[in-house]
Regions:
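Positively charged, small/polar-rich N-terminal and surface patches that mediate targeting and assembly
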Residues: 1-108
Length: 108
């Protein structure tokens, strides 16, 4: 089992969620986050004054994924979140040792 963290542009969330549902990944945690990579933010004009926006709004999803689905899951996220522009995001894949369902204590 693996844990996928993906960070991408917020307007792509529905597209990513629907694409993952189609391949059988139906549960995920979604968090609104801010960050920057190579693009280092941008400059905006507000009431006549320029200021630098260092952190850009992003969405982060976290989903448990069976080992056999990891390649298709990362490809699915990549295709659904892709715009071709700077700041499209990143996908991180990590080993997942154990999951415990709080309600029942079930592990797996």
């Amino acid at each position: 089992m693996k844990l996928i963290f993906a960070v991408f542009k917020p307007f792509k969330l529905d597209e990513v969620r629907e694409a993952l549902t189609e391949i059988g990944i139906t549960g995920m945690t979604v968090t609104e986050v801010k960050g920057f990579g190579r693009q280092k933010g941008h400059t905006e004009l507000y009431r006549g004054a320029e200021y630098v926006v260092d952190f850009l709004p992003k969405v982060q999803i976290m989903a448990a994924c069976p080992d056999g689905l990891i390649d298709i899951a990362t490809e699915t996220i990549r295709n659904a979140a892709h715009t071709g522009k700077i700041g499209d995001g990143k996908i991180f894949v990590m080993p997942l040792e154990e999951v415990v369902r709080i309600r029942t204590g079930e592990t797996g």
